Regions:
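Non-catalytic alpha-helical scaffolds and adjoining flexible linkers that form interface surfaces
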Residues: 1-19, 24-176
């Protein structure tokens, strides 16, 4: 049995009382797993899209055993736009990421986004950082150098990999 920590990106019904879930972990990438009894009426399921859990699964038959649930979010406090943001982030992760990447910061950026949502802080910058990490982990290297950005936004010169200028512009909500 393999143990990993992952993000649930998709939940679908499978046969009678079972669920098929897609998870993304840094160690094993995207996995589709079957959870027997996941829709049972006797036992409440903790398989919620967007939750980060510890999973235990077999590589032979992709049967999952949920070993520890860490609900690090307060869904009932979110408005519909914040819920849509979580759903969109999980959809992008599910569609774009499929291989393992130990250097990926997607899970960390997602946790930062959820923490900002929970603490009622400004979450748009963490969402943009999450999107950039998803693009980077999927193989696209967004070119955010000064020569490209200066054609779009009237900004002062900055180091090519230092994106704090861009995030400060977003933070100040300047419109151009």
């Amino acid at each position: 049995m393999i143990k990993t920590r992952g993000l649930i990106t998709k939940v679908q019904p499978y046969k009678d009382n079972h669920l098929m879930i897609n998870i993304y972990s840094q160690d094993y990438g995207k996995k589709s797993l079957i959870v027997f009894g996941g829709k049972s009426k006797k036992k409440r399921s903790s398989m919620i899209v967007g939750s980060i859990n510890n999973f235990e699964f077999s590589t032979k038959d992709n049967v999952c055993k949920l070993s520890e649930v860490q609900l690090s979010h307060n869904w009932f406090l979110y408005n519909k736009h914040q819920l849509k943001l979580i759903d969109y982030a999980c959809y992008m992760i599910d569609r774009l990421l499929f291989i393992e990447d130990n250097n990926s910061l997607v899970i960390d950026a997602y946790e930062e986004l959820v923490n900002n949502l929970n603490d009622k802080k400004d979450y748009m910058i963490s969402f943009f950082i999450l999107e950039l990490n998803i693009l980077k982990s999927s193989g696209y290297e967004p070119n955010l150098s000064y020569s490209i950005i200066s054609k779009i936004l009237p900004i002062e010169k900055y180091k090519d990999q230092d994106l704090t200028v861009l995030f400060n512009l977003l933070d100040q909500n300047k419109e151009f």
